[in-house]
Amino acid sequence: DVYKRQIAIGPLSIDMYLPALPSMAKDFGVATAFMSNSVPAYFVGLVVGQLFYGPISDRIGRIKPLYVGMVLYVIASVMCATTTNEYVLFVSRTLQALGACVGTVVSRAMIRDRLHPKQMAKAFSLMVLVMGIAPILAPSLGSLLLKVASWRVIFWFLAGFGILNIVLTRLFLHETLTDEFRNNRPMNDVLSQYWDLLKDTQFNYPAIGAGLLMGSMFVYISAAPELIMEGYGVTPQHFSWIFGMNAAGFVGLTQVNQWPVSYTHLRA
């Protein structure tokens, strides 16, 4: 359950505040389109953080990076909740993502450390399910909070969720990477492998294709609040339902995709 919460924190942080973007824009005195830049600001931190947490956790263990990331996440969430400057909000969102992505990276690594391959496959399936369900529920939860309080409460909620993860990590998780399996190579050597991957056509062609697909989804996430709520006059509550249906379709088609893949021979 702790792993599930660590995984869920990323999708919750992306999608939960989307219904609040128009009211945030009004508070800051800017256009909703400009306030939507807080979405790609988050993705910047998400991309950069994942490049480093993996090698770092392989070197010093899993728990320490997990604590550092979660503390950073809580601090950044509080900054989002209290700032009165839109640019500080954008920076805070990037820092929030740098903290949140530790849950995805380190939780996967801890599962690989602990479980047999068959159990690991089941655990990863549950993680994918959590990552699919969280975007469905997050906008609805955000719109419910908007009914009773301002948009700032959403970020206070996320800060509280981060604190809960820290407490649960302290109570129920322990170090899973023993000293004998730690990677003590210099960090430069580890990071140079990223460059080797970029030169490998068997990797980068599929990666480019997947990146374009994911990029289109992120563009939709950034543009949807202004397009749907302001363009069509949809309320935040109705927007959360529309967004949830999109997320449900994404999850459903991901499951359907398992059927043709099972009949396809993949080249090693």
Regions found by a protein language model. Name each.
Residues 76, 87-95:
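Paired small-residue
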Residues 48-82:
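Conserved MFS/SLC helix-loop-helix module at the cytosolic interface between two early adjacent transmembrane helices
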Residues 20-47:
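Extracellular/periplasmic helix-loop-helix junction of adjacent transmembrane segments
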Residues 94-129:
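Cytoplasmic helix-loop-helix junction between adjacent transmembrane helices
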Residues 5-25, 221-225:
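Extracytoplasmic
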Residues 126-170:
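Helix-loop-helix hairpin linking two adjacent transmembrane segments in secondary transporters
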Residues 178-205:
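Juxtamembrane intracellular "pre-TM" segments in multi-pass secondary transporters
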Residues 2-6, 264-268:
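Conserved small/polar residues in nucleotide/adenosyl-binding loops
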